[in-house]
Amino acid sequence: MSLDFNEMQERQKALQARYAGWWEPIDPEHGKNKILWMLAELGEAIQIVKRKPVSELMQEGSVRSDFIEEMADVLMYFNDVMLCYDIKPEEFAAVYRAKHGRNMTRWKKPGE
């Protein structure tokens, strides 16, 4: 089952509502903090990649599960950042697709 940005953002809104008053709010003033938390979670994923053999990342088990969980944390904060700055999934998708299109022709491979 796939997961899209609309669902992720709805889940983040529900999480924020559950902890309202305890967690910092989702607004532009706190966007910077969400980016920093996202980077901290990415750092945790990086530590797993640095310290564990790639074979353990590629096979079912606790290392792979822990790595995927850290990546999920990164995406949770990524969606918080999008919510802080009122970036809609459709807006992000359009920019992503445009950037991908530019990157597909940005560099020439040898012989092209």
What is each of the regions a protein language model found here?
Residues M1-E112:
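Flexible "arm" and connector segments at domain edges
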